[in-house]
Amino acid sequence: MNQVTDWVDPSFDDFLECRDISTITATSLGVNNSSHRRKNGPSTLESSKFPVRKRGNLSSLEQIYSLENSKESLSENEPWVDKYKPETQHELAVHKKKIEEVETWLKAQVLERQPKQGGSILLITGPPGCGKTTTIKVLSKEHGIQVQEWINPVLPDFQKDDFREIFNTESSFHMFPYQSQIAVFKEFLLRATKYNKLQMLGDDLRTDKKIILVEDLPNQFYRDSHTLHEVLRKYVRIGRCPLIFVISDSLSGDNNQRLLFPKEIQEECSISNISFNPVAPTIMMKFLNRIVTIEANKNGGKITVPDKTSLELLCQGCSGDIRSAINSLQFSSSKGENNLWPRKKGMSLKSDAVLSKSKRRKKPDRVFENQEVQAIGGKDVSLFLFRALGKILYCKRASLTELDSPRLPSHLSEYERDTLLVEPEEVVEMSHMPGDLFNLYLHQNYIDFFMDIDDIVRASEFLSFADILSGDWNTCSLLREYSTSIATRGVIHSNKARGYAHCQGGGSSFRPLHKPQWFLIYKKYRENCLAAKALFPDFCLPALCLQTQLLPYLALLTIPMRNQAQISFIQDIGRLPLKRHFGRLKMEALTDREHGMIDPDSGDEAQLNGRHSTEESLGEPTQASAPETWSLPLSQNSASELPASQPQPFSAQGDMEENIIIEDYESDGT
């Protein structure tokens, strides 16, 4: 009897029509329905005499039909980013060279890996939406490599009974069921490198080749990056499979790559670095056209098909982020969203480019174009420091006729310039940098773009005036924007060689940009101040007075000193050896993806404009503890307080002999 009742369809067919077939079977055969069947046993047996099974078959067909309709509706509402995600290399919107570079690394570190080889690490960087993670997954799938991806754990939801059990005074003491993210991350790396991935339902990939993918690091690593460095060092020793980190570039000034993976760690752990570029407009245009064609053929009149001009504006406004472009395309193609494309009729980007090449481009059209891009893309356009400096230093201009704008009178003709294609204030704002820091980079690189010494003098005057405006800490917050505007516009206006659109300014060849030497000089200055205060504490003078007034005279006096650290410091500060050749310091090149960050050893941002705190830089007069005499301290322990960058102590006799040799050499030369 029980076997018959197990296969009898329930009486509530209408309720079960909206449920899955597997769910119906499970509930009809489940244990939870046994009591219900025992209570309603006779009525169920009576109903089994009638042809209920045929009615059940009809309801099952209706359920299958409803499930198919629901799947179709779900596919229509599915995000196009997930619906059209690439499955092969040909579908990737990434440059072929980058794909080959990643594929070569995977073959060398996974497919051709030695048995006892340590853990290899790859760092992939690039802007958001350029296909970093997708490229790894697609290439791994094609080469039969398993991907074990780290996902930050979510804290479990506590129920009311859990809190009662934890804080129950009668029971024994209970700890919170919490484990730090760093501990969970270390355990994940250990398990992932030792054990293979579990074979889930529908997973046909069975191979021992695998990689570990980390895209979302625990937040604790951003506060304490040294913990991550220790994890990397240990993984290089004990790791059995490659480890890949994916970090997106940030244009807001937060350089996670420099914080988490400094150059020292990359060299120590032999970390490979592959940098992705934003998706090219041509590749993005081809990808969006394919999506529009498929959706138009599938949905017919359910979507609004954008024209070619709208797609061009969308590609230009998304700043190389294909994920943002696909989302904007899906949102704008929905029915009733025809007003998302505010543009001129008959205006295309290609026609606009033709106008600019033929020198017929006007300022109102340029302003309208910028408004179009901002309205369509839905994403703020930002600039890296390298490109922002290039726009200021190369200062491209648009040629204007007499009808476009009035000319200056003859006595002011030397100040006449063509109209700029960029707004300097907007360029600095899009670089997401403080204005005084941008002035430092501008001051370091502006000379190489000038051809006349008079223009350099005029530009240096503008930079000096800008530094004066931002030098006073009391008015710095109010005058910082004016200071940046004067510096950028002054440098642009002073360069007469680039004052007109037809001028090349010494050629349009590429010129490398460099980081400011101010950071290195100011770091050396701070170390000298701290060393002077540590080595000569009995002289109640600020560090600046010690180095400019006292120590140069002590170097000329014959006062016996037994402290080698003091002797070395006085010789380094108070004397300038004649054989030391002073020249330009070694400059560090500025890369195209680097942010303008303050040197970690140079202090706070307030030090950029020379506003040094009295306690750290100049040093307040420190009163020594009951000084009896003004003699130099003879303690040999002061040498340990000397910074590492200071020269090693050497005897004064050797320095005198060196000076004598130099004098003899010069006398022979004369």
From Swiss-Prot:
<keyword id="KW-0158">Chromosome</keyword>
<dbReference type="GO" id="GO:0000077">
    <property type="term" value="P:DNA damage checkpoint signaling"/>
</dbReference>
<feature type="modified residue" description="Phosphoserine">
    <location>
        <position position="348"/>
    </location>
</feature>
<feature type="modified residue" description="Phosphoserine">
    <location>
        <position position="60"/>
    </location>
</feature>
<dbReference type="InterPro" id="IPR004582">
    <property type="entry name" value="Checkpoint_prot_Rad17_Rad24"/>
</dbReference>
<dbReference type="GO" id="GO:0035861">
    <property type="term" value="C:site of double-strand break"/>
</dbReference>
<dbReference type="GO" id="GO:0031389">
    <property type="term" value="C:Rad17 RFC-like complex"/>
</dbReference>
<feature type="modified residue" description="Phosphothreonine">
    <location>
        <position position="44"/>
    </location>
</feature>
<feature type="region of interest" description="Disordered">
    <location>
        <begin position="593"/>
        <end position="670"/>
    </location>
</feature>
<keyword id="KW-0067">ATP-binding</keyword>
<feature type="region of interest" description="Interaction with MCM7">
    <location>
        <begin position="421"/>
        <end position="670"/>
    </location>
</feature>
<dbReference type="GO" id="GO:0003682">
    <property type="term" value="F:chromatin binding"/>
</dbReference>
<dbReference type="GO" id="GO:0005634">
    <property type="term" value="C:nucleus"/>
</dbReference>
<dbReference type="GO" id="GO:0005524">
    <property type="term" value="F:ATP binding"/>
</dbReference>
<dbReference type="GO" id="GO:1990166">
    <property type="term" value="P:protein localization to site of double-strand break"/>
</dbReference>
<feature type="modified residue" description="Phosphoserine">
    <location>
        <position position="75"/>
    </location>
</feature>
<keyword id="KW-0547">Nucleotide-binding</keyword>
<feature type="binding site">
    <location>
        <begin position="126"/>
        <end position="133"/>
    </location>
    <ligand>
        <name>ATP</name>
    </ligand>
</feature>
<keyword id="KW-0597">Phosphoprotein</keyword>
<keyword id="KW-0131">Cell cycle</keyword>
<dbReference type="GO" id="GO:0003689">
    <property type="term" value="F:DNA clamp loader activity"/>
</dbReference>
<dbReference type="GO" id="GO:0006281">
    <property type="term" value="P:DNA repair"/>
</dbReference>
<keyword id="KW-0227">DNA damage</keyword>
<feature type="compositionally biased region" description="Polar residues">
    <location>
        <begin position="620"/>
        <end position="651"/>
    </location>
</feature>
<comment type="function">
    <text>Essential for sustained cell growth, maintenance of chromosomal stability, and ATR-dependent checkpoint activation upon DNA damage. Has a weak ATPase activity required for binding to chromatin. Participates in the recruitment of the 9-1-1 (RAD1-RAD9-HUS1) complex and RHNO1 onto chromatin, and in CHEK1 activation. Involved in homologous recombination by mediating recruitment of the MRN complex to DNA damage sites. May also serve as a sensor of DNA replication progression.</text>
</comment>
<dbReference type="Pfam" id="PF03215">
    <property type="entry name" value="Rad17"/>
</dbReference>
<dbReference type="InterPro" id="IPR018324">
    <property type="entry name" value="Rad17/Rad24_fun/met"/>
</dbReference>
<protein>
    <recommendedName>
        <fullName>Cell cycle checkpoint protein RAD17</fullName>
    </recommendedName>
</protein>
<dbReference type="InterPro" id="IPR027417">
    <property type="entry name" value="P-loop_NTPase"/>
</dbReference>
<keyword id="KW-0539">Nucleus</keyword>
<dbReference type="GO" id="GO:0140463">
    <property type="term" value="F:chromatin-protein adaptor activity"/>
</dbReference>
<feature type="modified residue" description="Phosphoserine">
    <location>
        <position position="635"/>
    </location>
</feature>
<comment type="similarity">
    <text>Belongs to the rad17/RAD24 family.</text>
</comment>
<feature type="compositionally biased region" description="Acidic residues">
    <location>
        <begin position="655"/>
        <end position="670"/>
    </location>
</feature>
<dbReference type="GO" id="GO:0033314">
    <property type="term" value="P:mitotic DNA replication checkpoint signaling"/>
</dbReference>
<feature type="short sequence motif" description="RAD1-binding motif">
    <location>
        <begin position="6"/>
        <end position="14"/>
    </location>
</feature>
<feature type="modified residue" description="Phosphoserine">
    <location>
        <position position="645"/>
    </location>
</feature>
<feature type="modified residue" description="Phosphothreonine">
    <location>
        <position position="622"/>
    </location>
</feature>
<comment type="subunit">
    <text>Part of a DNA-binding complex containing RFC2, RFC3, RFC4 and RFC5. Interacts with RAD1 and RAD9 within the 9-1-1 (RAD1-RAD9-HUS1) complex. Interacts with RAD9B, POLE, SNU13 and MCM7. DNA damage promotes interaction with ATR or ATM and disrupts interaction with the 9-1-1 (RAD1-RAD9-HUS1) complex. Interacts (when phosphorylated) with NBN; promoting recruitment of the MRN complex to DNA damage sites.</text>
</comment>
<feature type="region of interest" description="Disordered">
    <location>
        <begin position="31"/>
        <end position="50"/>
    </location>
</feature>
